[in-house]
Structure formats: structure tokens, C-alpha cells
């Protein structure tokens, strides 16, 4: 299970924080050991009494060191005996100076080396006229004054945040949840109870030091310097608290009221009432019902309770959940409005990602969920965990659309993080689906209306070894309609799920996308000013489309290659989905070598297991069958497992694009020059890029092909007569092991090229001006289904209309086809050139079969 980490500290962007200096020195030195000066007796006695109840998690994880010789004063958010003792223990644990030993010459004028920004209120709330205390810290004012008097003094302030019971242990009981950390400043007794119940889950966050001397050197008046330093520290503590436990959440009712009170919703209500001829009050109630149907009902106690439950569930059905690259995200995220945009493979994605974020000390986002999941009991629990529900289709319902947009705008303006799946639904094939830009558009418009905090899109790849929905996906891919979700089916399936093992899950954080950077590139005319609600700049749609594709590309660039992915790549390349054990080991070894020696990106992760361990693991989770034979064991996948395995091959198909291209070129050709191989690859690349969300430019893809060639030559898969562009590359003529492995690598892209040739063949056969894009899609699907029946069995996505639609759209973008006034597709001789290029890749028999089965459009009978 993921390790429980507390959040890394955000980097302050203020002038004072950025002026941290660790290169200078001071005449004063601070002892780093407690042996020379002992802590007060009361602190030692109380510390010993409290020690059994405390278990500290220190951030940053590595030992904190401030060893440049300058004195340290710790800054707490508020005073309190428990906080003081916890800080003292944390300093002893990290071998830092004790906060209970005063500095030389005592610049704080206190018998200690820490201060707090605010004191827990001890005023009597029953006395209405009692005034609060001072608005600034006397200790901080004394420290600044000491620096003005003594030029040699240079103290470092180290902000320290303390959170007790942010994630109570499962063993600590449900009562502990009531006393876990929140936004309220609590009294001494409640704080003591929190320590007794949740002290073993205490997080102590040390921040980088702030130089008081450099702050004074800015030359501000004394009062302004004090106010500015306090503001910087308050901002820091607020950001850390938001990162750990989330923003101070408003109630669901307040959020709904705010949505209904916006100008846009009021205008939409009036317009809808006028169109329908109804009273304003009736239409207002309709809008209110929409808002209540959408809104989340975020509840920290329910979230903490769900953590207890799902920890047991994940431990039961999964062999671990691995999280990669989350630390770099935690360094970047503070100060941003974060939008999590994960891949969508399973209903488990919702709960799994929330669980991982919570375990990593990150506040849960508000999650967009389909209204189909708003089931009795389940829907309520999901709302309590931050889900808000939207309808699958909102086209034509202007009032609902505006209510939803305003709800999202309220979340963005309130600083809540969001999570949504831009594919619109779960992928049934294992590929990333073409993105839908609706939620991105709402997020972008909300930001442009109130550009307060920068927005950060965080792509996330979720990889499984076995799918809980595997059986239902098989039914849907075979043509059965999707079954409607129901609470009874859910409860009926729970025992079945809990009895099975689903392998390991990997969650990879991709490279984040800063919205401001995208706007600077695509909308340089926007200068950060707020836009009106109805204002839609010309660049808005293109920016949304760019963001959507960029997110999908970054998700693919953070893929994880697990044992099942590697097995699928190897076994599905053979006609009977079977290999001898030695051949399978060799093929897996080659795939891993390609991934490790030619890395796709620095965020792709590859299983560390050996091929032998991979095979054993697949047998353990009942994916692989071993057939014993005197000449050597054969390993195979049968029946439904073979179809499901294509899902896991498609997860990582993009990682082998360049190597599969090179291998395809030698499947039906024994000899080819480097320059021809690269030229054809660059010509084919736009279509592969559109389908697989590849990150390279055409020149970068050409370089990648060159690197693949060099690797294949080193491995003996290809023979090279020289290193010049015109020098031929050849493969062996006989059926050697090298030829077998080369053919296996080529298989992953073979079906894509077959689909491309089917499309071009049907266009050419029917002639220009005959078929519309939708008619062409339908004919392509029919031809692909027939080819699958006649030529060889293929994966169900081979005749997926969406893949043909994407290829046709790319043909239009490249102006290889274009519509006439009747929306029929026209083309010229360039399409014939593309058809000739396909002869290099596809065999003569296959090309002939495709040309023969390519259907013609039904023509009207002559009158």
C-alpha cells in the first residue's frame, strides 16, 4: 500500500521568503547539541509523559539541516503546551537545536527559541465588550528590534506546522476521527484529547529558513516590516494547512445558494421562464433542483471513515498500490488551483485515486462523476467524499448547462481542487479515448472570469494488471448493450470481487501543465485581466482543444509497463496466442531492453521483475496457462483472456511506436535503406500521433527511428552495410530467432496500418465526391469486420468506428481529403501515393484481400 507521506512544503513566492540566504555567516553561533545546556526540568518531565502518545512524521522526509552556524528561532502558528512539547521532540528527533533553550543574548526577551503568530483565545465569549489582544506578535517585534540594534545579529526564522491526527490509524477507532486536525482553533482540553487519541499520527512540517537580516535590508519602516513578515508567515501556514487538510469548506447549501444568486443563473432562469411560459418561481425551483442534483456534500469525517474501509479492501484485492512522481507534484502544487486529469479505465479510478491522494497527505479534490453513479446509498457516500454529479448529455438544456458552469466557477473561485476524466467515459479497449473538452472549457472560463490563483492541470496514469469490469467489457465489445448501473447489481458483485486477486496497481503522476504557460503561448494578447461572463475570445476553443490533447499526451508519457503489458505484447503477436517458454522470455527481454535503452520519457516506469518472475506472476493471477510438453513447456492465453489481454497491450502500444514501425517495414521486405525507412515513417507519423497521442515532432520521431535502428543492429535483428543514409539495412532470410522477434515487435502496429489501408482503399474504389465522412466510417467498419472473419482474428477495437473517424479527421486536417458543397469527400492523386506507400508495409495477399472486400456505396437505381 502507498506509504503515508505528509505534504512537502510549498515554496513561498514573496520577497521575504525568496531572500533566504545560506551562504553568509554570523558572529553568533548556535549549539547543535543539548549536552552543553539542558532543557528545563518541566519540559523534560512533561516530554517523558507525552512521549508514549506521540509518533512524529517529519517533513521533509530526509533529515532537516540548518548547519550554516546562524541561530534559529522556530515559528509556530499558535501557542500551546502540546505544540511546544511536540516541536521539542521533533527537534530532538532531527538533531536540531531545542526551542526551549534561549539564544545567546536572548533577542526574543523570552526564555526560549520559538515564537507563535497567534495565541489560542482565552477570552470569555460571554463578555461581549471584551476586546482581543494585540494583532501582532510581541516576540517577533522584539526580534526585529534586536536586529536593528545589533548589526551582527542574523537570526533565521524556521516556520513549523504541526498537525495532530490528520490521518488517524485504522486501529485507533472511529472516535479518533472527531478529534483529528481541522481549521478550527481548539482549546487546551480538546488539544490534549487530540494528542491522546491521534498523537501517533502527528505531522511536523519544517519550512526553509527566512533570514531576518535580509528582510530588514529591504529598508521598509519598522511597522511595515513587522506586518509584512507576519503576513508572509500567515500565508505560509494557511497554504500548508490547505495542502494537508484542504480549504475551509462551505456547506453544500451555501454553495448552492451562491450558484443560484449569480447573474448568469438569474438571467438563464428569466430566459427559460419566458421560453416555457412559466412563472419565475417555478423555473427557479427547477434551477435549484439542478444545483442540488449536481452539488457535492464534502465531509471530512466520512472521508476519514472511508479511508479506514478502503485500506482493508485494497489490501484484500490488490497486491499493492505503487505511486510514482508524487513528490515532485507536491513541490509544484502549493499556490495553484489543481485540476487532476487521470486516465479512465475502471469505476475503481474514482476511489483509488482519492485513496492515494489522501494517503500521500494531499487534500481530496471535488470529483466529476456521471449521474449514472448517483445510486441510492452509494451516491450519498460519493457526494460526502467530494463527488458532484453531471448528466451525460446537456445539449439543448441551457439552464442546466449554466447552473453546472456556475457551480464549477464557484469551486474554482473558492480554491477547491477538481478532478475529472476528459475521455468522458471508461475506455473499453485500453487506449486513451479522444478527449472531450466540456469540463476543460468550464474550468478555463471560470479562471478567466476570476484569475486569482494559477491553474495547474495534473495528468495521472492509472495502470492495472487485471480489471474488475473485465467480463462486462467483453460483453460490450462483443456487441451487447451497456448494462445500467444499479445498487442491487453492485451489492451482488461485491462478494465476487472480494474473492479474487487483481494484481498490482500503479499510479503515475505525469508532467503538470501550467495554464498560464499555455495561455502565454496560444493567447499572448490576454494580459491577465478578468473577462466578462459572456465574453468568449476567438482563441478559447483552440486553447481547449490544445489542452485536451496535451493532457492525453502527458498521460501517455507517464505510462507504467507492468508484467501483464509485456506478456500481452509478446503473446498476442502469435496466431494462437502461445509461445514456448524460452521464446517468451527472449521476447519480454527484448521489450524491456527497448524501453530501458530508448526511454519514451523520464516519467515512464517499467516493472523491475525478470521475465521468469513475470511469467510466474501471470500464472498466479490466472491469466497465463502452462501446457507441459516433452520438448518444452508452452505458455498461452485462452478464450476471453486473449481478448482481455489486448486491453493491456493497448495500454502501452504508444511506447513501441518507433520500434514497431521499423519492424513493420521489414515484415514483408528483406532490404531497405535508412533514408527510405525514415521518410516513410515521417509521412505516416501524423496519423500515428493523432491515434496514440505521441509527444514528438516529426524531426524527433525521425531521430527516434534512427536510435531504434541502431539498437536493432546491436541486437542482431537487422544487419547494416554502413552508417550512411543510403546504406541498406537487411534482415535474415531464414526463420531465425531474430526474425521471429522482429515480427513479434511489428504486430502491435500492424492493425493500425490495415485500418488506414481499408479507409484509403474504400475511398479510391468509390471515387471522389461519392462518400460523406459518416458513410465512409460505416463502410470501413463493415470491411474491417469482414476482414477479421476472413483473414485472421483481431482485437475488437480493430473495427472501432472511433478509430476510423480519427483517421478520416486527420486526412481532412492534412487536406488530403476535403468536403464538397454536399459534404461528400473529394481527393486527388496524393491519396494514391499514400496507397502505394502502404505496399511497403502490408503483404500482397493482405492488400489484395482488403481491395476485394472494400465495399462500394449503394447507388440509387436509375429512373
Swiss-Prot record:
Entry text on domains: The HXXXXD motif is essential for acyltransferase activity and may constitute the binding site for the phosphate moiety of the glycerol-3-phosphate.
Biased composition (Polar residues): 12-29
Cellular-component GO terms for this entry: plasma membrane
Family recorded in the similarity comment: Belongs to the GPAT/DAPAT family.
Main location per the UniProt record: membrane
Pfam family, one: Acyltransferase
Protein name: Glycerol-3-phosphate acyltransferase
Annotated NCBIfam families: plsB, PRK04974.1
EC number: 2.3.1.15
Amino acid at each position: 500500500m502507498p506509504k503515508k507521506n505528509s505534504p512537502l512544503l510549498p515554496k513561498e513566492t514573496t520577497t521575504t521568503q525568496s531572500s533566504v540566504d545560506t551562504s553568509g555567516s554570523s558572529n553568533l553561533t548556535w549549539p547543535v547539541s543539548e549536552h552543553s545546556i539542558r532543557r528545563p526540568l518541566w519540559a523534560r518531565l512533561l516530554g517523558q509523559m507525552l512521549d508514549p502518545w506521540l509518533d512524529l512524521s517529519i517533513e521533509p522526509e530526509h533529515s532537516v539541516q540548518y548547519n550554516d552556524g546562524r541561530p534559529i528561532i522556530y515559528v509556530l502558528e499558535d501557542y500551546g503546551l502540546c505544540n511546544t512539547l511536540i516541536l521539542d521532540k521533533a527537534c530532538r528527533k532531527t538533531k536540531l537545536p531545542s526551542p526551549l533553550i534561549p539564544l545567546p543574548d536572548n533577542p526574543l526577551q523570552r526564555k526560549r527559541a520559538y515564537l507563535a503568530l497567534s495565541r489560542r483565545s482565552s477570552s470569555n465569549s460571554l463578555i461581549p465588550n471584551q476586546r482581543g489582544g494585540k494583532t501582532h506578535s510581541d516576540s517577533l517585534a522584539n526580534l526585529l528590534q534586536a536586529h536593528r540594534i545589533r548589526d551582527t545579529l542574523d537570526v533565521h526564522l524556521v516556520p513549523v506546522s504541526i498537525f495532530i491526527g490528520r490521518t488517524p490509524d485504522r486501529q485507533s477507532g472511529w472516535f479518533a476521527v472527531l478529534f483529528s486536525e481541522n481549521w478550527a482553533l481548539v482549546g487546551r482540553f480538546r488539544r490534549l484529547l487530540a494528542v491522546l487519541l491521534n498523537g501517533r499520527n502527528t505531522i511536523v512540517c519544517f519550512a526553509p529558513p527566512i533570514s531576518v537580516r535580509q528582510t530588514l535590508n529591504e529598508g521598509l519602516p519598522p511597522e511595515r516590516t513587522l506586518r509584512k513578515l507576519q503576513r508572509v508567515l500567515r500565508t505560509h501556514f494557511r497554504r500548508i494547512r490547505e495542502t494537508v487538510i484542504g480549504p475551509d469548506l462551505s456547506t453544500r447549501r451555501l454553495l448552492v445558494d451562491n450558484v443560484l444568486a449569480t447573474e448568469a443563473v438569474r438571467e438563464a432562469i428569466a430566459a427559460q421562464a419566458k421560453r416555457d411560459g412559466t412563472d419565475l418561481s417555478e423555473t427557479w425551483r427547477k434551477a435549484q433542483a439542478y444545483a442540488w442534483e449536481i452539488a457535492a456534500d464534502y465531509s471530512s469525517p466520512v472521508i476519514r471513515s472511508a479511508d479506514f474501509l478502503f485500506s482493508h479492501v485494497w489490501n484484500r484485492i490488490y497486491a499493492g498500490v505503487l505511486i510514482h512522481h508524487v513528490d515532485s507534484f507536491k513541490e509544484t502544487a502549493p499556490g495553484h488551483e489543481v485540476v487532476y486529469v487521470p486516465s479512465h479505465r475502471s469505476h475503481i479510478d474514482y476511489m483509488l485515486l482519492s485513496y492515494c491522494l489522501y494517503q500521500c497527505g494531499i487534500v481530496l479534490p471535488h470529483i466529476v462523476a456521471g449521474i449514472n453513479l448517483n445510486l441510492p446509498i452509494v451516491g450519498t457516500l460519493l457526494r460526502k467524499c467530494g463527488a458532484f454529479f453531471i448528466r451525460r448529455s446537456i445539449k439543448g438544456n441551457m439552464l442546466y448547462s449554466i447552473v453546472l458552469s456556475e457551480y464549477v466557477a464557484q469551486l474554482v473561485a473558492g480554491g477547491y481542487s477538481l478532478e475529472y476524466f476528459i475521455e468522458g467515459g471508461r475506455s473499453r479497449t485500453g487506449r486513451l479515448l479522444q478527449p472531450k473538452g466540456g469540463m476543460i472549457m468550464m474550468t478555463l472560463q471560470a479562471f478567466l472570469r476570476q484569475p486569482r490563483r494559477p491553474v495547474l492541470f495534473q495528468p495521472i496514469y492509472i495502470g492495472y494488471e487485471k480489471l474488475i469490469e473485465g467480463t462486462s467489457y467483453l460483453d460490450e465489445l462483443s456487441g451487447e448493450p451497456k448494462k445500467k448501473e444499479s445498487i442491487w447489481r453492485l451489492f451482488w458483485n461485491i462478494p465476487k470481487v472480494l474473492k479474487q486477486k487483481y494484481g498490482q496497481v500503479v499510479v503515475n503522476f505525469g508532467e503538470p501543465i501550467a495554464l498560464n504557460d499555455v495561455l502565454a503561448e496560444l493567447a499572448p494578447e490576454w494580459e491577465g485581466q478578468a473577462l466578462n461572463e459572456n465574453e468568449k475570445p476567438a482563441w478559447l476553443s483552440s486553447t481547449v482543444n490544445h489542452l485536451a490533447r496535451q493532457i492525453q499526451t502527458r498521460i501517455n508519457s507517464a505510462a507504467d509497463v507492468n508484467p501483464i503489458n509485456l506478456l500481452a505484447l509478446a503473446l498476442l503477436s502469435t496466431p494462437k496466442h502461445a509461445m514456448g517458454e524460452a521464446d517468451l522470455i527472449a521476447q519480454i527481454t527484448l521489450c524491456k531492453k527497448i524501453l530501458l535503452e530508448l526511454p519514451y520519457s523520464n516519467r515512464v516506469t517499467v516493472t523491475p521483475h525478470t521475465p521468469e518472475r513475470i511469467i510466474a506472476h501471470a500464472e498466479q493471477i490466472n491469466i497465463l496457462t502452462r501446457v507441459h510438453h516433452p520438448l518444452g513447456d508452452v505458455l498461452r492465453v485462452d478464450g476471453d483472456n486473449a481478448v482481455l489481454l489486448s486491453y493491456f497491450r493497448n495500454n502501452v502500444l504508444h511506447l513501441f511506436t518507433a520500434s514497431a514501425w521499423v519492424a513493420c517495414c521489414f515484415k514483408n521486405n528483406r532490404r531497405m535503406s535508412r533514408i527510405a525507412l525514415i521518410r516513410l515513417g515521417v509521412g505516416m507519423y501524423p496519423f500515428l500521433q493523432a491515434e496514440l497521442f505521441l509527444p514528438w515532432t516529426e524531426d524527433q520521431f525521425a531521430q527516434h527511428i534512427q536510435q531504434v535502428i541502431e539498437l536493432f543492429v546491436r541486437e542482431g535483428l537487422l544487419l547494416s552495410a554502413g552508417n550512411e543514409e543510403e546504406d541498406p539495412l537487411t534482415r535474415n532470410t531464414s526463420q531465425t530467432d531474430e526474425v521471429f522477434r522482429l515480427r513479434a515487435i511489428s504486430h502491435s502496429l500492424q492493425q493500425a496500418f490495415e485500418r488506414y489501408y481499408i479507409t484509403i482503399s474504400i475511398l479510391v474504389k468509390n471515387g471522389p465526391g461519392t462518400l460523406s465522412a459518416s458513410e465512409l466510417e460505416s463502410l470501413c467498419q463493415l470491411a474491417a469486420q469482414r476482414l477479421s472473419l476472413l483473414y485472421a482474428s483481431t482485437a475488437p477495437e480493430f473495427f472501432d468506428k472511433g478509430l476510423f473517424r480519427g483517421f478520416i479527421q486527420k486526412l481532412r486536417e492534412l487536406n488530403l481529403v476535403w468536403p464538397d458543397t454536399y459534404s461528400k469527400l473529394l481527393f486527388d492523386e496524393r491519396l494514391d501515393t499514400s496507397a502505394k506507400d502502404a505496399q511497403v508495409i502490408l503483404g500482397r495477399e493482405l492488400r489484395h484481400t482488403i481491395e476485394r472486400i472494400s465495399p462500394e456505396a449503394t447507388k440509387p437505381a436509375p429512373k
